[in-house]
Amino acid sequence: EYAGFSDHTPWEKVNPNYKQINVKNALADKNSIFYYYQKLIELRHTMPVITNGRYALVPGNEEDEQIFAYTRQDDDTTLLVILNYTDETVNRHYNVPADAKLLISNYEDDQNDTIRPYEAKVYQY
């Protein structure tokens, strides 16, 4: 009755979409946001560059109101993080080395310079 959180009336209203968006469904879907965040946490624990690397905003991105792009870099690794904060598809070119690996993304494929609505992707090189 209360989205599985309690047998008692909660002080906060339960979201009306709780039957579709809930932990039980997220655990059953390997592509859910639950597992996406697990992967992010795993990367944070296994890649020191994420917490200790030098931060730098990508040149030319200072005034971009749609895309936030930055690097984290240490002596061994560079991460390029590209985030689209809008509900629009945006085209931007970043100099991603040919040998760069797409480390994580919230889309299943990489469309290079096309950054889809709310897309977040991290390249490692």
Give a label for each model feature.
Residues E63-D64, P97-A98, P117:
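A short, polar/charged loop/turn motif at coil->beta-strand junctions and beta-hairpin connectors
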Residues D110-Y125:
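C-terminal beta-strand-rich structural cap/linker in extracellular carbohydrate-active enzymes
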Residues E88-Y107:
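Beta-strand-rich binding/interaction modules
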Residues E1-L79, Y85-V90:
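Loop/helix patches that line or flank the sugar-binding groove of alpha-linked glycan CAZymes
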Residues K39, Y55, L102-I104, E108-D109:
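Generic hydrophobic, helix-prone segments enriched in Leu/Val/Ile
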Residues Y18-V23, I104-D110:
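A short, terminal or domain-edge coil/loop segment
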